[in-house]
Swiss-Prot record:
Source organism of the structure: Xenopus laevis
Transmembrane segments: 31-54, 66-92, 102-124, 144-168, 194-219, 265-291, 310-334
Top-level taxonomic group: Eukaryota
The protein's name: D(1C) dopamine receptor
Family from the record: Belongs to the G-protein coupled receptor 1 family.
Length: 465
């Protein structure tokens, strides 16, 4: 009877171990599937960006797109040189690649840093294009862009391969703890405090402060221009009819909606970046101090963060590389290139009015961004500046085209482009975007009102990025 009881206990323990093993196997299979989907989406998105620029010359002609390409290359490196090795480790439960560990750690630091620094460069490029568009047009050449990109990649290499190959990054306490343990099965980077803080400052904290500052300034500039345009619209409405109270209310509501749209887009750009990377870099600076032994303490303190929690936040940071193509390279030009590459021209919608997206545009634009009013004819139409042809604007308009001349001399445009049936059209920007922010020049607003229309041969519009 006693032997039978022992047999039952043994069988029950065996079944329990089998259930645990099946559960662990299912969890690893699910983890492998999710990580594989993340890697494939990162590869697909960033490969499409690179192919689009290689295939379409007009995308290579814009200096701004050089920064987007550099970002896509760094994210591709994350998907090729970093993610797969860690995914295999997560599924297997241990590091299976032996002495490749140090090289992998260096690739991880280099690619992640390059991706973040490229995001910082894009924010600076946008700010300069918006704050000083005419100077940006002159100064931001291909040579300057390549220098900025080169600095970002050089800095990424300097803080990754040199310290890792010289073992400056390792924690001596972690090395002592690993004595007697097979190092080839554990690829724990265990950074020392000095390297953890200095690398985190360069890789994340300084860039994120710069990005917050630049995008805050971009929002304030956009807000100012929205309100100026709103005041012009109210002036036009007041010139047409005496009852201006209703028009003022509508104009204020429109202005508020535009400001909200700009703020929402910028919040998503910064929110996604901070959400993905901030938890990892907080832990990255905190963990080296958690392993510090107090004086007189015989046993080391337990780690303040579990390995599972840390790995989850590592993958959160890498997931940012899969989102960057959607945020920074999904504007009208790139979308058309993507549909051509994927061969879905026949099935994809080609509506001229773009929906709100979170690409290079601050707020997605309409292909016709001209605010047009019909007013009874009270003066000569020839005093109007030439109106931009819609097809011309479609060709010129995508992300951050800096400053473009949108119209030429009166003799180069036919009168039919004015579309003036029984009234006069006035050209005044109604949409604040990173494409066209304002009809204002350095000397003041362009004359959108009938009483102020001047006979000028050239009409400049400031374009954002």
């Amino acid at each position: 009877m006693e032997n039978f009881s022992i047999f039952n206990v043994t069988v029950n323990v065996w079944h329990a171990d089998l259930d645990v093993g099946n559960s662990d196997l299912s969890l690893r299979a699910l983890t492998g599937l999710l990580l594989s989907l993340l890697i494939l989406s990162t590869l697909l998105g960033n490969t499409l960006v690179c192919l689009a620029v290689i295939k379409f010359r007009h995308l290579r002609s814009k200096v701004t797109n050089f920064f987007v390409i550099s970002l896509a290359v760094s994210d591709l490196f994350v998907a090729l040189l970093v993610m797969p090795w860690k995914a295999v480790t997560e599924v297997a439960g241990f590091w299976v690649f032996g002495d490749f560990c140090d090289t992998w750690v260096a690739f991880d630091i280099m690619c992640s840093t390059a991706s973040i620094l490229n995001l910082c460069i894009i924010s600076l490029d946008r700010y300069w294009a918006i704050a000083s568009p005419f100077r940006y047009e002159r100064k931001m050449t291909q040579r300057v862009a390549f220098i900025m990109i080169g600095v970002a990649w050089t800095l990424s290499i300097l803080i990754s391969f040199i310290p890792v190959q010289l073992s400056w990054h390792k924690s001596h306490e972690a090395d002592e703890e690993l004595n007697g343990v097979n190092h080839t099965e554990n690829c724990d980077s265990s950074l020392n405090r000095t390297y953890a803080i200095s690398s985190s400052l360069i890789s994340f904290y300084i860039p994120v402060v710069i990005m917050i500052g630049t995008y805050t300034r971009i929002y304030r500039i956009a807000q100012t221009q929205i309100r100026r345009i709103s005041s012009l619209e109210r002036a036009v409405e007041h010139a047409q009819r005496c009852s201006s109270r209703l028009s003022n209310e509508n104009s204020l509501k429109t202005s508020f909606r535009k400001e909200t749209k700009v703020l929402k887009t910028l919040s998503i750009i910064m929110g996604v970046f901070v959400f993905c990377w901030l938890p990892f870099f907080v832990l990255n600076c905190m963990i080296p101090f958690c392993h510090m032994n107090l004086p007189g303490q015989n046993e080391p303190e337990p780690p303040c963060v579990s390995e599972t929690t840390f790995n989850i936040f590592v993958w959160f940071g890498w997931a940012n590389s899969s989102l960057n193509p959607v945020i920074y390279a999904f504007n009208a030009d790139f979308r058309k290139a993507f549909t051509t590459i994927l061969g879905c021209n026949r099935f994809c919608s080609s509506n001229n009015v773009e929906a709100v997206n979170f690409s290079n545009e601050l707020v997605s634009y309409h292909h016709d961004t001209t605010f047009q009013k019909d007013i009874p004819v009270t003066f000569n139409n020839s005093h109007l500046p030439n109106v931009v042809d819609q097809d011309q604007e479609v060709l010129e308009g995508t992300c951050f085209d800096k400053v473009s001349v949108l119209s030429t001399s009166h003799g180069t445009r036919s009168q039919k482009n004015l579309h003036l049936p029984a009234g006069v059209q006035f050209e005044c920007e109604a949409e604040i975007t990173l494409e066209t922010i304002t009809p204002f020049t350095s000397t003041g607003p362009l004359e959108c009102l009938p009483q102020l229309v001047a006979d000028e041969d050239r009409h400049y519009t400031t374009k954002l990025y």
